[in-house]
């Protein structure tokens, strides 16, 4: 394999959904894992030299430090089962490469790239490097392909070469999108959203909960100060409520809460993107062709 598999005018497109999948995989990675590694799925169009990355899934891996060498072992059975499961719903998607959330290439990248070279059969695998540390306030993405180097009969190696990456997988002409934006700008009427009523409901529930907690604290203080006779039914209900809550320290609760909040925000963002894409596609389908 060589870089000739990818011509200079080859277009590699990355769907935004894949980035959200990689972010989610990084957030839900095993506790001892520093990075997330996974498989990239997509479509190859050899007629116009286009590769579109449309899907991905995380692959479980283990990292071992052997001297100065870092060895990464993938769960190949898990990767195979995930690919077969994806083929049931999306048989047109094939393995086009792999991703890693490390900040830079490592010595183990060559071994992982060799594995995906076998999975991609007659095509060169892509390697997407996504740095999620947000250095400079940006989500840095880099796309590589592997180029074998060395002399015949001697030591051989692999050199990673950067490829251009287009982060929008659309074939719609820019002028069409601009016309849609212009129409919305000239007609700024918007329907009231549902976010504010939902926030008001959350606020009302929170205030009601605070009132009940204040009432409960006053009752406990009055009983301890012998200003009120204790009620066995109330005490039994309090005991059952307290014992039903798992005991955990403040740091564990904070991590669990933040993880759940991230999941909710990712779900909301993804659903909003899908809704916007559907609305935009519907608008574009009704535009006249010029």
Swiss-Prot record:
Assigned GO CC terms: eukaryotic 43S preinitiation complex; eukaryotic 48S preinitiation complex; eukaryotic translation initiation factor 3 complex, eIF3m
SMART domains the record matches: JAB_MPN
Protein's gene: eIF3f2
GO biological process, one term: formation of cytoplasmic translation initiation complex
Protein name, as recorded: Eukaryotic translation initiation factor 3 subunit F-2
Assembly mode: Component of the eukaryotic translation initiation factor 3 (eIF-3) complex. The eIF-3 complex interacts with pix.
InterPro entries the UniProt entry points to: eIF3f, EIF3F/CSN6-like_C, JAMM/MPN+_dom, MPN
Keywords: Cytoplasm, Initiation factor, Protein biosynthesis
Pfam families (UniProt xref): JAB (PF01398), MitMem_reg (PF13012)
Molecular function in Gene Ontology: metallopeptidase activity; translation initiation factor activity; translation initiation factor binding
Subcellular locations according to the entry: Cytoplasm
Protein family (similarity comment): Belongs to the eIF-3 subunit F family.
Domain spans labelled MPN: 12-150
